[in-house]
């Protein structure tokens, strides 16, 4: 037998020298076999998972072992015994288990071609020869050998017994450790790890499978270490695949051939040296063929793409495992390609993505979204540069070039134009950008089409002007907004009645006009011109809501003429003032007086004609005078004729006429103000007072010129007086005949008197009634009445993301209104201010907490302003003919009264119930009693209202509007009872425990709400009694109620389909009919709560998602008013009731987060979220939510178009306001807030500066102040902060004070009193 064909087994069994070289040969060959037998280089094939072959012992003994055996048995060297005894009588040198292992090794080695068949036969022959020779030599001296052999057996058995005992001890210890580990695993996790017994039994006979020990005690003795190189096909459902890992893709399914077979492994897997045998070459060729066939089988398998990560921190971000596909061209370089993919840098990925976006832009140049995505993606390259400032400029230039190319393909795109100009303002000079804006606006306004003006362009232009500090002036902004409004009115005239969606276009345009009016009023008010703003709103409301009936068919010029006479009359106070009666009544009085005057004139003329004969000379003189007067009157009449024919004139001619009138009125007003100082004594007294004041000021300046503290005190007193006058003298001044009131006004301050010329350009009539009501609400919000935050009873007027509503939400600047935002938030105990343990900056946010719980003047309004607002409500509700939708106005008036005095509000609501018999007022009356803490009175009101509903149903068939009110009353009654149950258990949680321990069912808690639902569906209310429900029939009762809800829902859906089909012909009435015919929000809320009580949280969630995700129903379209009300009210009640019926808290939290994804800054949802997470003290979870949404807020990726929300940032700051060590986070929140469109909001800059002052960082506060005046050059409060804050004034010198005052005068900010003059 040659060495080339000698197997490892034969080489070990035949040792010619007998010196133990066979052992060395065995070690060498064993090392080679184990080295070649290692698996591939994948992460599964590391050293800890190799197959253990340490226990493998060969079956043939060597001569050294025989020598050791002869020494052990005391055999002489002269003895002829040279071979071991026969197998039947010789003691075993290994145990039975080792025999089995050797047999298995033989089978494995045969399968893997370690042993040739020929060598195996030769070895068997050698064994037979050796055994026959042993038998021949065993005849001599067998007695001593048998004795020693028995002795050896006993000792061997003792050793085996001791080894078995030690093994049993070790196994017991391992089992105990394993039991301890198994207790840590849950049933779900354990079931994932355990391999089923069926599958393991199928593969137990095959020795090549090493079953995992973890979790399966049957196969625990197979191996001491876990091995993961078993066949995965029965687990994964596919053969020839395994799970791999890479840095780029993570865990992925890859074919075994990808890592197990390459060229080197194929050549060196089974042989350490190249073999010349034909059998080995044929085997290697067959293996290559099998590898190629396996690769061809998996070529067409597609990749499994991962799921995109959800940004919810509470949800898992697990991706699906990818499947790698092998291509035919790169079989040999698979490992190299994977290494390249793993080592692919982030820069390479960004370049790939950038090239893809460039290709999309080239293919679809008219797609604006692709251009914007390409521009925004350029920001990703900034992370690869070391110098951030240089990279920003280069990035801006690159983005500008992309925008230029996009505008070449889309020159009429407003979005691209606006984004281009926004970006240019960051890089170019402001004057250059302003010139470019003027070109854009002139080209857009010169169009002769119906789109003569673009609201978006003008809004962005105003935003640019507010940020352009160098060129900013109040008068410029005012003129710009007025020109925009006039152009929009011209656009409204271009609409024709026959056009499609005529009323919708009119409504949208008028809403845009209201937005510009609101913006103008806020700018003028913040600049100090509050009287002019109030005059504008007064004139618009009088002109639209109190139009005289006699002038309803008159032209615009006639209306302006008559309104001018009414406004300039001194006998009739305007709306808001005491004893105001409105334009309509005052016009009838003026008309009657003019008729009486004409009659008197006619009588006088008759008397004069009788005396003509006696006074001829006098008559001649009088005629001459009369001729002169007639000439003057003719000129005036010509002007009036021009005003009467205003509709026939062009806009330019109208402007000329109005300017002429302005000049005349200005001259008249100057004459009026000159008349006020006729008496010489008053003039002399005033001059003496002024001289004395000037002398005192000069003496103070001389004495305190070197004393900076006194100078600062002067500036502080001046600034505080200026702010006090703004708060006191906010109302316009009426000009009386004697003009005695003007003594309190500065002689140079004529801004307190509002003239007709100050607002005549803004006078126009609204077409839609809803916009007239919105004008009133806008005026009330300007005066300090937050309509949307007063109470939940006031329904929103617009959808959540409507620009008008977003504007009112983001215009919060009053600290008292801010406290109303957090009324639903569970207040944390505020730390004591003098305590040294808490930082000083805590007192910055004291205004956030509403400590005034006595419901007296929650709005913090002054008495004169409360009377002014009350007069507006009364006049509009009692005397207005122009507003027909007064129900919302009544509700807001009740809630305004409740915020001032709740008892007065209850008396007024009771009078409305007796007057109108409206179910809504009954509901409000019950809610006011509930707020007062009178629960039983509120329940009595609801019960009497339900009995009254029974009478209404029996008398006549209820109309649609009446049915909606019935749904409202029952739903409010239901929610009141549920809230009482929740509040009772929240005060004493032991009640619920005692209730459950007494073997009561949770449904028994809600018998009263279920009774209300039964009466609601039956349409017949009955008094609740304890015998109403029976526990034995409760399931049958719930099934009946469920059927009734389903039947009612189907009926309403059928009516909706019929009404929608009938109203499809008339487009004007389609919007109103769809809302009135749909299922009411209150009915759907009752249905959802019933599902929660009867079928648990699962049944409720199915119904809620089915209702809110209905795409066919426009009534419940996402972000609509009805969708918002349904979502907010339903989740509010679910968070209270669902924990009482054993719902998992995590599911409730997920429901809140899903709703916040739709309404990310809703105050109610944010309060619910913070209250829910605060129970578990999970601060990081709340911070993660605000951090993730702040990115969307800054990048304008939320649902709104405003690009920022003041409510969102205020809630984020409020959450951190009472936490020690949160100063840096609050500072970062302020910086993020002012980087959005909230940079023009006063409240953030004001709080930020005060926050840094309380931290003791005055220099930082000073730098923030200079940043604030650059973004808010129109805000008088921001300008005067160094003059009103004593701490901040310490770091300003006299020169800086004087410079600030000069800038205030330059920007056109109004100052009521003279500024102190102090030398630098």
From Swiss-Prot:
Residues 14-26, 118-129 have a biased composition (Acidic residues). It is found in: Nucleus speckle. It comes from Dictyostelium discoideum. Keywords: Coiled coil, Nucleus, Repeat. The keyword Kinase does not apply. InterPro entries: HAT, NRDE-2, TPR-like_helical_dom_sf. Pfam families: NRDE-2. The lineage of its organism: Eukaryota, Amoebozoa, Evosea, Eumycetozoa, Dictyostelia. This is Nuclear exosome regulator NRDE2. Residues 34-48, 598-640, 703-713 have a biased composition (Low complexity). Residues 1-55, 74-203, 598-644, 676-716, 1056-1078 are annotated as: Disordered.
